[in-house]
Amino acid sequence: MGSPDSSSGSAQKPPRHQHQHQPPPPRRQGSAPELPPGFRFHPTDEELVVHYLKKKAAKAPLPVTIIAEVDLYKFDPWELPEKATFGEHEWYFFSPRDRKYANGARPNRAATSGYWKATGTDKPILASATGCGREKVGVKKALVFYRGKPPRGLKTNWIMHEYRLTGASAGSTTTSRPPPVTGGSRAPASLRLDDWVLCRIYKKTSKAAAAVGDEQRSMECEDSVEDAVTAYPPYATAGMAGAGAHGSNYVQLLHHHDSHEDNFQLDGLLTEHDVGLSAGAASLGHLAAAARATKQFLAPSSSTPFNWLEASTGGSILPQARNFPGFNRSRNVGSMSLSSTADDMAGAVDVSDGGNAVNAMYLPVQDGTYHQHVILGAPLAPEAIAGAATSGFQHHVQISGVNWNP
């Protein structure tokens, strides 16, 4: 007969083959919930207030335990991501709010090493449209974190969006006034202002601004086209013949920019001092084509850019003059004027003793007098443009087929 101690001990010992079922350990704060792959938590302002903050204030069950309860003002913003339950670039929290002063209604925005500063005004959060219209269910406030003490804090890129309830929904979570005075003495004042507010924390980056800048610079590079012709519209040239605009360039007829070829620049050819601009000028495409043909006709041997502006200012851009059949170098072309006839101005190239002054080479033209009109609106032959180029554009040539008296 065994001892009672041994029998009682054997009866209390459970069999080895039986397993005790224990409840799972409670989920620790900050651990990620069990969510399906690809799940993203990015609710709208209305969804945050109606489906999360409002239910939290009413102590109703939430759709999913994904928002952690953290007193935000006891931490710096860079410490909060590890306190969150879920999130990658933005994190959500339920947080209480305290008063700054016991007898006031201002919230305390101080944190560990800085403070949160409100920016802008409160944005109302409206519920979806109903039969009675859209109802205001909450407000949203934006805040920026500053390191240091106010008002000389250093601004950071940490942003907070604070959501709080309004109206009847805020009665159970907000105490906007200090405790009343009872029996001639004030009860111990509570610093709690809101039981719960919902906050979204994120760090603003400049990646978006940098991407926009890179795209804009790429578009500018693509807009650089060879043989680009830039001209003012007709309505812009209509009023350029006024007397108050002497000596200024009105039209950039052609700008050819090519880093791999000789630069051919036809800029500032026409000024009001030389010619009178006409409102009926049109179709600069012919002039651009003629200018490009002139480039091939002249074929400058120098590798330096060829600039017509140097020719118009008296710079020596041509080689020493040669005798051409049918031209007389003995004529005094300097005495000729714009009113001379074609017979008087059939002259030749004249270089004064090898100097820098380049006189005009006149082409055989039809009978008639010269008038100051812009050579626009009609196709020009490359030979005509070449003749005008060698003359430095000191005088203008009348071309057949051009209406000089519009």
Swiss-Prot record:
Portion annotated as DNA-binding: 137-210
GO molecular function annotation: DNA binding
A biological-process GO annotation: system development
Role description: Transcription factor of the NAC family associated with the grain protein content (GPC). Accelerates senescence and increases nutrient remobilization from leaves to developing grains. Sequences of 11 European varieties of H.vulgare tested belongs to the same haplotype while the sequence found in H.spontaneum, an ancestor of the cultivated H.vulgare which has a higher GPC, belongs to an other haplotype.
Protein name, entry field: NAC transcription factor NAM-1
Keyword Glycosyltransferase: no
Keywords assigned by UniProt, alphabetized: DNA-binding, Nucleus, Transcription, Transcription regulation
Chain intervals for the UniProt region annotation (Disordered): 1-40
Compartment(s): Nucleus
Note: High grain protein content (GPC) is a desirable trait in breadmaking and pasta wheat varieties because of its positive effects on quality and nutritional value while Low GPC is a desirable trait for barley malt and beer production.
GO cellular component: a single term: nucleus
Stretches with biased composition (Polar residues): 1-11
Pfam families from the UniProt entry: NAM
Chief localisation class: nucleus
Every NAC domain range: 35-204
Domain comment (free text): The NAC domain includes a DNA-binding domain and a dimerization domain.
